[in-house]
C-alpha cells in the first residue's frame, strides 16, 4: 500500500497532510495539515460553537466542515482520536479525506487489525455530490474492510432539502449507506453525545461545564434531525432526546419511556457558559432555557407530522452507481408526471358504454 498522506509528530499527537501534494495556502487557513490526532485534535470552544451550532442550534448557514473521529477496538477501547477539517482552497470535505483509498484511515486499519469501530461526529451529514463522493468512499471502504462498523453522528443535515439541485443524489446515497445497518448507524448528535464531544475534543472546557444541560433550541433541532433522517432513509435513529416538559402529559408513549429510562447528569439551574466576547444569538427566551433530557429509543416516541410517512416501506438500494442527470432533469425531480390521454379515453368510453346500456334498459321497459 502506497500512502497518499504524510504524517508528522507534534507536541501532543500528530499532524497529517491528507494528500502529499498539499502545501500552505492563503485560501485555506488549515492547509496543509487537515488531519490532527491525539490532543492535537482539540479545537477551541468558540470554533466548535460556531461550526456545530452549539448550544442554541444552527442560527446561520455554515460553510466549514469539521469531523471528529474515534477509532476503537471491539471491546470499546480507544485506539486513536482525531479530527479532519475541510479544505476551502481545494474544496475537499473531511469525510472524503478520511476515507480516501490509500488515505489515512485506510492505512491506519491496514496496519492495526485491532480497530473494529469508527465513530464520526460531524457538523454536517455526509454528502455524495460529484466533487466530493464522501458516501461512495465510505461505502467502498466498508466493502474493503467487512469487519469494520461505522457510526456517524451529525449536528445538521447537509444539502438534503428538496430545492437544492443535488439533494436527490445526497438522499439516495444516505439511503444506500443506511441500508448497511447494523454495520452503519446514521444519527443526529443529541443529549449525552454532546457532552462526550465537549469532553474529548474541545479545549478549555472541564468539570461541570462539560455536563451543563442542553438548551431547548439545540434539543429541538436534534429531534427534528432524527425524524428527517428517518424520513430520508427509512431507518430510525436508535436514540433521541425527550424534553422534560413531555412528562406533563401522562397519556403519551413518551411518558412511559421517561419513567423507564434514568435521567442523565444535568444541572437544570445553569445555562451553558459561552466563550468570553462571544454574543448569544437573539433567540426567544424558551430556546435559551436549559433542558433536562433522557435518551429514549425513537421507536417509543409518538410520531411527528411530516411530509413523508416514516412507516412506509422502502426499497433499499445497495449500490451507488447513479446515472448521470442533466441540471434540468434534477430540477424536474419534484414535478408530478403528466396524465396520459389513454386513461381519460378509457374512462370516457366506460361512461359512454354505461349510459347506452341504461338507455337500452329504459326502451325495453317501455315495450
Swiss-Prot record:
Active site: 95 (proton donor)
Cofactor: Zn(2+)
Domain CMP/dCMP-type deaminase stretches: 61-177
Record InterPro entries: APOBEC4, CMP_dCMP_dom
Record key words, sorted: Hydrolase, Metal-binding, mRNA processing, Zinc
PROSITE patterns, per the entry: CYT_DCMP_DEAMINASES_2 (PS51747)
A biological-process GO annotation: mRNA processing
Binding site residues for Zn(2+): 93, 127, 134
Tissue: Predominantly expressed in testis.
One term of GO molecular function: hydrolase activity
Keyword Cell cycle in annotation: no
Protein EC: 3.5.4.-
Enzyme class: hydrolase
Domain of life assignment: Eukaryota
Coiled coil: none
Entry similarity comment: Belongs to the cytidine and deoxycytidylate deaminase family.
Biological role stated in the UniProt entry: Putative C to U editing enzyme whose physiological substrate is not yet known.
Protein name per Swiss-Prot or TrEMBL: Putative C->U-editing enzyme APOBEC-4
Organism this protein belongs to: Homo sapiens
UniProt lineage: Eukaryota, Metazoa, Chordata, Craniata, Vertebrata
